[in-house]
Amino acid sequence: MTTKRKPYVRPMTSTWWKKLPFYRFYMVREGTAVPTVWFSIVLIYGLFALKHGADSWAGYIGFLQNPVVVILNLITLAAALLHTKTWFELAPKAANVIIKGEKMGPEPVIKGLWVVTAVVTVVILFVALFW
């Protein structure tokens, strides 16, 4: 049976998400995927340059030294750090850690993840620079 009643459809503008800070931040966080695509393209370009010899690699290094590319890479780094921060803040909500019958707060988990990230970064830099 069909009805002739018209259901109420609440009007919604295309900028509805700009009104609440939570949704604005959500859109910024999801927007961090765009700089990640840039970084992926730069890495693929570097792999092809490495494959094609020393002259191509020198051209790639020159490309990386371009001030515009440096600025884009700094923006990408900031976006990656923001994305990492938000994921580290979500981790304690996904894993309930219970010690001596009490649920552990989020701070130790978040700090632990940052410590692991820092240690792994230092080890990778050490291996890359001094090995």
From Swiss-Prot:
Belongs to the FrdC family. It is found in: Cell inner membrane. Keywords: Cell inner membrane, Cell membrane, Membrane, Transmembrane, Transmembrane helix. The gene is frdC. It comes from Klebsiella pneumoniae subsp. pneumoniae (strain ATCC 700721 / MGH 78578). The keyword Cell inner membrane applies. Part of an enzyme complex containing four subunits: a flavoprotein (FrdA), an iron-sulfur protein (FrdB), and two hydrophobic anchor proteins (FrdC and FrdD). The keyword Amino-acid biosynthesis does not apply. This is Fumarate reductase subunit C. It is a multi-pass membrane protein. CDD domains: QFR_TypeD_subunitC. GO terms for molecular function: succinate dehydrogenase activity. The chain crosses the membrane at residues 30-50, 61-81, 110-130. Two distinct, membrane-bound, FAD-containing enzymes are responsible for the catalysis of fumarate and succinate interconversion; fumarate reductase is used in anaerobic growth, and succinate dehydrogenase is used in aerobic growth. Anchors the catalytic components of the fumarate reductase complex to the cell inner membrane, binds quinones. GO terms for cellular component: fumarate reductase complex; plasma membrane.
